[in-house]
Amino acid sequence: MSRPESRSGNASTPQGTSVLKADDGGSGQTPGGSTENSVAYRYVAVQQMTSCRDHIEYQLTVREQPKQSRMCGVGEKADRRPIDPAPIVQLRVVTHDRPIRQSDPVGSASVAPPVERRPGQGAAAPQTPGVRRGLPVTTALGDGWEDKAWYLENPYYFMYAMLCNADTDEELHLLNDGKTRYTSGSCVSCLYHLKDIDGSHQGFFVFPDLSIRVEGRYRLKLCLFETIGHSVHHCKSIYSDPFHVYTAKRFPGMEESTRLSKSFAEQGLKVRVRKHPRSRRRGSKRTKDESDASDETPLARHVSPKRARASDVLPMSGLPMSQPIASSRMPRSMDDRFERADYDRTPSMASAYYDVKGAPPSRHAPWEEEEVLRLRESRAWDPMYDAPSALYSHHAREDRVEDRRLPPRDFADGRYMDGDYPPHTRSAAAPLSSMSARAGPSEYSEHVRSVYLRDDPVRSMHGSPHRLSAALPPLPPPLSKTPSHPALVGRGYPESSASLTPAYSRNYPSVPAPAPAPAPMPMRPAPLLSRSYDHIGQQSSGRIYDDYGPRPNVVAHYSGSYDPRDALARGFSPPSPQPGRRSPYASHHPPTQWRSGPPSPSRPSDYHLGRASAVERGYAAARRSPIPSARGIDTPPEAYAGFESNPFPRRSFGVPDAGRPAATYDAPRAPPADLYAPDEGPPSGRLGGIGFAPSSRERLILPPLPVPSPLSAHRGELTPLGTRDRDREAAYIAMPRDRDQGLAPTERYLSPSGYNPRAGELDQRDREWEWECERERERERERKRGPASPEYRRDFAQATMPSKPSSRGHNQPY
């Protein structure tokens, strides 16, 4: 192979020969003697040994063995995971006078470096032509010369790193798919002329960006090549020590960089340097890898704020803290625990929701470093924590305890209360006797979230509570006003009566305002009941907080079980009317109760004139009676016993012996309400006066009732079985009705079995007229059927016999 003479290694060419070349404007002078306008460059010829190559000894030493690596993956998920530490190989070239025998071109990693000979030992100069002269050294193969100026500046040396099996030394190039390499990154390195840690000039091959895709145990085969002309000569190969490639979960972490790597980084080589070992923490989703490098190295990277770990800022402490507040600001009394803490000053419910969701409790104690407090205050807390007047209203509950956690930020309705005292100078209130020590924090959060997270116009926004003190006695019970909120009990107000119930309901979540007058406050219609007798226990008028209290300024929706006539039975019972004024033809007076329902569909003018129909008068009187029979509750054993002797087991029509036992009629009945007594008119205010006058927004608006059903016309009980009863029902539907009674209740108001609302609700004259019409229609049916038996006639006469003869004709209207 022919090469230029300047590139040959013949002895005829002097070792120090150099060719001086200048630009076009210069002369053949040295750079120091050139003119000012000329720039001279000196080119040194690269000398290679094309002959006597069997006299050259290549020594390869692995200065940094690879120990571990993290697999980088395949495809789009692949990333850079370099081998730790980066493999570094040192090269030394020694020439000998005689050819050396290298049976195996692949050497081991541990080769004894050449030793310099003392002066006078061995040959002073190589005797073989073409052998480089230099510093005399001694190696395992004999005496030789090492010319560093020759091979350290040779750019034709390079090294290739390939992956091999750790046990079989099998070379691994491609994966099973046949197109993906085992390694990723740069697997080729040129020769770097660098200083060693002792300051000597040496040649190194460095692989700082070599990654492996698959987990396993491998070796690196490092092959040295030299390019000569248009060909490449393989010089020598070396194997590294075995190392393991881990998965992301099993990777132990990056180790601290060695002194050699740090020295190379200081000289400008692109090597990642870690000053401290990066060990993987348990439970961490991120692995400590080479991406977090030092800022002092050339490959240092700024860590992204999004990828910053809490361990870089927070101290490693195991003290649990729910909120980052100092110990001096912890709540010191039971009442202070339910106030908003002084670091929480945001009244907006939306912001409190996001703060709670986005800021979980910290695991570190905030008093260990001041930087933690600054970070926490800049993230979520209001810096105006020194304002003494920022006091929040707290909502206490009877079952709160001392060892509860701090409530969440959105446990109140976010309103300020004007307070003239700092939150930490108050005296601790005495614990209430009604507090339950077993109540958990979940009950409190459920109570306050469902009750107080609304704008209630009844509760004052700026009402400042009385300041509590240990020396002051508890406040006396108010005479005309009862605290409308359960939180006032914890501030010194006495508890209400024993019938006090929680102000929480799934139907009406707000708190009703109690009546200040001694007269009982009219209540809303009864709620929807699941049993027919559940309304008996709800007639108590001594309750202050109603479970089904009305929501202020909200129109109540229509309910199928609601009857407008229930409003008459909610008030107090007036004195019994005179016997002579029970006639429907007597003079009418305004009613004593102010109606909150809509006008009757049949006669709208009755409510403006103060008129009440006979059905409403009897219904109201019967519902206020303490006797079950007067309220229309039949006795099932007596009602269904002896059907053969009583053809009307469920419709007694006022006869004591027909459908109910006589014992229920021996007790005195409650006097009906005097619906015709003069009244002063509706009260002026909502809570003032005797009656109850709701605003127009609270009037119950009911939809129009459908057409009455034949099965429920003029009464609410179920139709008895039997042919006679069905015929009697048809005759009852055909009879004329009083128009004052309005529309009869429809099928939606059918009461359950055993409940008879018509018992005692009609006037005596109305019942007599009903009996008369029923008897006439029964006679017509009997004539059409034929003669009846004497027993049937006797039973029918006894059951339908009125108490006194009727004073009206057969077809006489009202």
UniProtKB/Swiss-Prot annotation:
Task: Spell out the PANTHER family in the cross-references.
Answer: SPORE DEVELOPMENT REGULATOR VOSA (PTHR33572:SF18)
Q: Which family does it belong to?
A: Belongs to the velvet family. VosA subfamily.
Regions of biased composition (Basic residues) lie at 271-285
Name of the protein in question = Spore development regulator umv1
Q: Which Gene3D superfamilies match?
A: Velvet domain (2.60.40.3960)
- Assembly information from the UniProt record: Forms a heterodimeric complex with velB; the formation of the VEL2-VOS1 complex is light-dependent.
- What UniProt keywords are attached to this protein's entry? Nucleus, Sporulation, Transcription, Transcription regulation, Virulence
For domains, the record's comment is:
The N-terminal velvet domain contains a NF-kappa-B-like fold and is involved in DNA-binding.
Q: Where is the composition biased (Polar residues)?
A: 7-18, 800-814
* All copies of domain Velvet, residue ranges: 53-274
Q: Which InterPro entries match?
A: Velvet (IPR021740), Velvet_dom (IPR037525), Velvet_dom_sf (IPR038491)
Which locations, inside or outside the cell, does it occupy?
Nucleus
Return one Gene Ontology term, BP aspect.
trehalose biosynthetic process
**Which cysteine pairs make disulfide bonds?**
none
Residues of the region (Disordered) are: 1-36, 96-134, 267-333, 407-441, 457-501, 539-814
A Pfam family of this chain: Velvet
Knockout mutant characteristics = Leads to reduced virulence.
Give any Gene Ontology cellular component.
nucleus
Give the function comment from the record: Component of the velB-VosA heterodimeric complex that plays a dual role in activating genes associated with spore maturation and repressing certain development-associated genes. The complex binds DNA through the DNA-binding domain of vosA that recognizes an 11-nucleotide consensus sequence 5'-CTGGCCGCGGC-3' consisting of two motifs in the promoters of key developmental regulatory genes. Required for gall induction and teliospore formation on seedlings.
**Motif (Nuclear localization signal) on chain:** 438-445
At the highest ranks, the source species' classification is: Eukaryota, Fungi, Dikarya, Basidiomycota, Ustilaginomycotina
Start-end of Low complexity biased regions: 620-631
Composition bias (Basic and acidic residues) maps to 407-423, 723-741, 760-796
